[in-house]
Amino acid sequence: MIFGIMGAMPDEVDQLCAKLENVTVEPYGGVDYHKGTLAGKQVVVCCAGMGKANAAATTQVLITKFGAEKIIFSGIAGNMTSKIGIGDVVIGKTVLYPDAQLDMICQNPPFLKEYTGDPELIAAAEKACAKAGVKALVGTIATGDLFVGDSETKAAIEAKCAPDCVEMEGAAVSQVAAKNGVPCVILRAMSDNADEDGHEVLVVKKFSIAEYVATATRIVAAMVEAL
C-alpha cells in the first residue's frame, strides 16, 4: 500500500517529511515528491501549491507516476459553522465546488456534482483526532480558487451550499481521486472564520500554522499507522 500525502503550503508538509525514513526526493513537474516510510508504510509526501489546478495536477502525478493507492490531504481552512472553532478539524464527508457549473462538470467521469470521502479513511481520521485530543467534525468542505476573507462572500457561499469550511484545493483532489478510483480524504483545521478577521490574520499578518502542523502531523501519522 502506498499513501499519497499532500498539503498546499510547505509548512503543511515539512514536519511530516522530517518524520520519514529511507527518504528519497524526486522532483517532477515543479513539485518535490518525498518518498519514504512512515510507521513502516510506504508514503509519498508533497506540497502541491495553492489552488485547484495545482491540487489536481499533483494528485494525478501521485497516482500515475508514484502509484498512490490512498490520498490524504491536510491543511487549513476558513470556518463556516458554529459547531466548531479555531483549531478544530473538519473531515470531509462531502467535498464540492461552490463556484462551478456542476451540471457541466458531472458530464464527464466520475460523473459527480460532489465528492465523498472514503469511509475507511474518515474513520481513521476520526480515531486519530480523538487520540490527539482534537475536536473533529465530519462534514462538508467547499473549494474555490479565491481566498474567502469578507462577510459578503462568506454569506453567498453559505446560501449556496452551507459548507462547514472553505478552502482552495480539496474538491480538485477529490475529483481526480474519484476519477481514478482512488480512496481519498480531506482534513482541514480551522485557522480563521472566513471573514474580515481571517483576511487580517492570514493575508496581512501571515498567520503561523506551526501549532496546527504539529497536530496534523500526529493525526496523519496515526492514520497511516492504523491503516
Q: What is the meaning of each model-derived region?
A:
Residues M1-L20, Q42:
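Short, conserved "active-site rim" segments that organize catalytic pockets and cofactor/ligand binding
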Residues I2, E26-L227:
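Glycine-rich phosphate- or other oxyanion-binding loops that anchor nucleotides, phosphorylated ligands
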